[in-house]
């Protein structure tokens, strides 16, 4: 396609329990908007956002998964092509925090070994309803050697920072190539196999 | 519920027949009152026999037998009462189960991992996971294609692609659709892209 509108394509994935705000986090980042009504994601969806890092235009294709158990067989098939995974929990929902180890295990089982991981404690604007101390999030992130942010899609806290940091971490691992030798293909986004494109 | 009126009737009969009436009753309908009536009748007749020591001997045994009969009658009526309550409870239980059963149909026979689907429910589950997977894949594919087309349209609108190159560009797009299976078009595409966007990448780097 006449699309050298970007230099690199990174594929990211959002996972975590149902209702923690994965879709809202993504919506804030891609459209800078927030919607309070809860609409459960059906299976899997994605959004595109192009950012500029170190003079490179990086197209982020961000896959948003349904947290509900009944979609897991569909969503886990999308782990494989992800270069970065954001694991989201809700600081007002203890269960969503307890399930982090389960999600991390899912990553180990289904994602690429060198996938860049990040932990997000969302809804940090709701401090009066907080049940997960920030320290606990930091601790579990440290134990697994991954980055951690507390975010709020509603109050727009740390959302862009989280995505840009994850993209930077992936960029750092990306071998430098002659920019125009990239031939990335976003039109096959639906299939896992579509991502064997030479984008990394 | 049926017994008390019956008993009353019997008592009335008994009253009419005098204490002797108790001796004519069915042993299964005997009450403690009847036993006392029988005791009264027998005691009276024993007294009439005089004070022979053998009669006295016999009297002790008769009293003992009557006491035993009294105990058995009391015990029996208690058991009947308990059984009657038990029967009423079970009747209610059966009634309830029958009502549930007619609502839930054959559910009782299903295994632990089975589910009953209400065929009249318009929102009942009816598609398979594979079907959902296919639809989602197609949706996401179309969505990404739309994004590509939108970007391309933006290029035309902003004048990045000169109008005279329009037809060529369009032909190129046709080739792009089948790009995955056509490696040669890749090269062609890249050169065109490079031509069209060289000033852009120059600006970026």
From Swiss-Prot, chain A:
Reactions catalysed, as given in the entry: GTP + H2O = GDP + phosphate + H(+)
Cross-link (Glycyl lysine isopeptide (Lys-Gly) (interchain with G-Cter in ubiquitin)): 102, 136, 154
Short sequence motif named Switch 1, residue ranges: 32-46
EC number: 3.6.5.2
Source taxon at top rank: Eukaryota
UniProt GO molecular function: cadherin binding involved in cell-cell adhesion; G protein activity; GDP binding; GTP binding; myosin V binding
CDD domains with a match to the protein in the record: Rab8_Rab10_Rab13_like
N6-acetyllysine, modified sites: 102
Residue sites binding GTP per the record: 18-24, 35-36, 40-41, 67, 122-123, 125-126, 152-154
Record's comment describing the protein's domains: Switch 1, switch 2 and the interswitch regions are characteristic of Rab GTPases and mediate the interactions with Rab downstream effectors. The switch regions undergo conformational changes upon nucleotide binding which drives interaction with specific sets of effector proteins, with most effectors only binding to GTP-bound Rab.
Known partners and oligomeric status: Interacts with MYO5A; mediates the transport to the plasma membrane of SLC2A4/GLUT4 storage vesicles. Interacts with GDI1 and with GDI2; negatively regulates RAB10 association with membranes and activation. Interacts (GDP-bound form) with LLGL1; the interaction is direct and promotes RAB10 association with membranes and activation through competition with the Rab inhibitor GDI1. Interacts with EXOC4; probably associates with the exocyst.
Designated name of the protein: Ras-related protein Rab-10
Organism, as annotated: Homo sapiens
